[in-house]
Amino acid sequence: RIKDIRILKDAKDMVYLNVGRNDIKDITCLKDMKQLEIISLENNNVKDLTPLTELTNLCDVDLYNNVIEDLTPLEHLEFISYLRLDHNAITDLTPLSKLKYLRSLTLKANYITDATPLKDLELLEALRLDDNPIQDTSVLESMKFYEKFTN
C-alpha cells in the first residue's frame, strides 16, 4: 500500500491520477497539478482537501471512503461534474452549492442533516444521500430528478 505520493510532485502535466485503495493521508504534492481532470483517491485516509483548491480543470473526482469533513476547498472547482464522497465525515454541503456543472453526486453514509445547499444545482441528474440523518426531505422532493432514498 502506498502511503507517500510526493514522488508525483513534478508530474505537473498529468491529466488522470488513480491512487485509490492505499493509505494516503497527505495530498499536498497534488497542488501544482493544474492539468488534472480526473482524480481517484478513494479508500485512503485523506482529510484535508486544500491541495485541490486550485485544480480548476477537475471534472471527475472520487473521494469516497476517506476521513473528509470540510468541503470548502472544492467550492471553486466549478467544472466538477461527477463527485463521489460516500463514507466520509461530511456535515455541511454549502461549498457544493457553487458547483453549477455537477451532474452526479454521491454522499452516502456521511453525517448530513440538511440538503438545502443542493437545491439550485440545475444540472444534477443523480444524487445519492442514503444513510444520512437528513431531517427535512422537502427540498429534495422539489428537485426534478428526486428518487426515493432511505436514511
Residue ranges and their predicted role:
Residues 1-3, 7, 12-25, 29, ...:
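Concave beta-strand-loop units of leucine-rich repeat
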